[in-house]
Design a protein with these regions (language model features):
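Solvent-exposed, non-membrane alpha-helical residues enriched in polar/charged side chains
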Residues: 7, 11, 35-36, 59, ...
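Adenosine-nucleotide cofactor-binding segment
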Residues: 1-30, 80-86
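A broad detector of short, well-ordered amphipathic alpha-helices
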Residues: 32, 111-114
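Short acidic-hydrophobic, aromatic-tinged amphipathic segments that line or gate anion-handling sites
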Residues: 4-6, 107-111
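Glycine-rich beta-to-alpha transition loops that act as phosphate-gripper elements at the mouths
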Residues: 25-28, 103, 107-109
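Glycine-rich phosphate-binding loop and adjacent beta-alpha segment
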Residues: 29-100, 125, 132-134
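C-terminal capping/lid region of NAD(P)-dependent oxidoreductase domains
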Residues: 16, 20, 92, 97-106, ...
Length: 134
């Protein structure tokens, strides 16, 4: 699928106004079409790039009047532990209130925790993997 076709598919999924926030955890050939589908004054978050480091025409940011921001989660947790703790607490509150429902794709008993790690390392995990201690 070419960039324009992929961008049109993203736009169709987001609606005519486009996406207010793009959370790009893939990168590579998917980043430019995602940026093309962003709404006016949207926000594009660069989180990861397992598909490769994207090369995008930056004039799209001007045409969309949008922002691109890098999100380095590991550094954030180390540099701003108080904010990190507050955000985790807020996420758990939202989950408890039923406002968000994280995708748990698989649950492992503690003795199979290594299998969960192997699945993460091989990028086979979809959603969250949970290791239980019962």
């Amino acid at each position: 699928m070419c960039i324009r076709d992929r961008a049109n598919a993203f736009k169709a999924a987001c609606g005519p106004a486009g996406a207010n926030i793009v959370y790009d955890i893939v990168g590579g050939q998917y980043s430019e079409p995602a940026l093309r589908s962003i709404a006016w004054e949207g926000r594009f978050l660069v989180v990861g790039f397992p598909a490769g480091i994207a090369k995008m025409p930056l004039n799209l940011t001007l045409l969309k009047s949008c922002d691109i921001a890098g999100v380095f989660w590991g550094a954030f947790t180390a540099r701003e532990p108080v904010k990190f703790r507050q955000q985790v607490e807020e996420l758990f509150d939202l989950m408890k209130a039923g406002k968000i429902d994280p995708l748990v794709s698989e649950t492992f008993p503690l003795e199979k925790g290594g299998d969960a790690i192997a699945k993460l390392e091989s990028r086979q995990a979809v959603g969250k993997l949970v290791v239980t201690m019962d």
